[in-house]
């Protein structure tokens, strides 16, 4: 049986990830998610390179492009990317077979995205990276160490 997200009764089951700044109605966003060829990929190491993402996600089909997430101030990788495929079917294969696998010793997560728009490659946290990293309390060397608030206090070694 092939998974077809266009037949779901509950649109929230389509994607746990939602762009909070989506310009449009919830219904528009749900329609875009049901027909999109774009995946949001999170929990990447800050050291993961674009060619690594192409190589892994290319196993599922023809990748149109990869857009690496960047710290909006430093313009350095900040742990996420968007992967665009030419077809929905290839994106579905990637979602089914690559999400929750390891890349650079990290379990990555992929989910549907409504479609990349210029500017979304930049982190939205107040320090320029991802918001989720600003709430992280543990030390994570693959994602910049401590979050910046803890780092400014000298680290939380508990």
UniProtKB/Swiss-Prot annotation:
Inactivation phenotype: Lethality in 98.7% of embryos.
Keywords: mRNA processing, mRNA splicing, Nucleus, RNA-binding, RNA-mediated gene silencing
Single GO BP term: mRNA export from nucleus
Residue intervals of the RRM domain: 37-115
Gene Ontology MF: a single term: RNA cap binding
Cellular localisation: Nucleus
Sequence segments annotated as region (Disordered): 123-158
Pfam families registered for this protein in UniProt: RRM_1 (PF00076)
SMART domains: RRM
Amino-acid positions noted as binding mRNA in the UniProt annotation, renumbered to this chain: 17, 40, 109-113, 120-124, 130-131
GO cellular component: nuclear cap binding complex; nuclear envelope; nuclear periphery; nucleus
Taxonomic superkingdom: Eukaryota
The keyword Nucleus is assigned to this record: yes
Biased composition (Basic and acidic residues): 130-145
Function: Component of the cap-binding complex (CBC), which binds co-transcriptionally to the 5' cap of pre-mRNAs and is involved in various processes such as pre-mRNA splicing and RNA-mediated gene silencing (RNAi). The CBC complex is involved in miRNA-mediated RNA interference and is required for primary microRNAs (miRNAs) processing. In the CBC complex, ncbp-2 recognizes and binds capped RNAs (m7GpppG-capped RNA) but requires ncbp-1 to stabilize the movement of its N-terminal loop and lock the CBC into a high affinity cap-binding state with the cap structure.
Subunit structure: Component of the nuclear cap-binding complex (CBC), a heterodimer composed of ncbp-1 and ncbp-2 that interacts with m7GpppG-capped RNA.
Family the entry assigns: Belongs to the RRM NCBP2 family.
PANTHER family recorded: 20 KD NUCLEAR CAP BINDING PROTEIN (PTHR18847), NUCLEAR CAP-BINDING PROTEIN SUBUNIT 2 (PTHR18847:SF0)
UniProt protein name: Nuclear cap-binding protein subunit 2
Species, as recorded: Caenorhabditis elegans
Taxonomic lineage: Eukaryota, Metazoa, Ecdysozoa, Nematoda, Chromadorea
Gene: ncbp-2
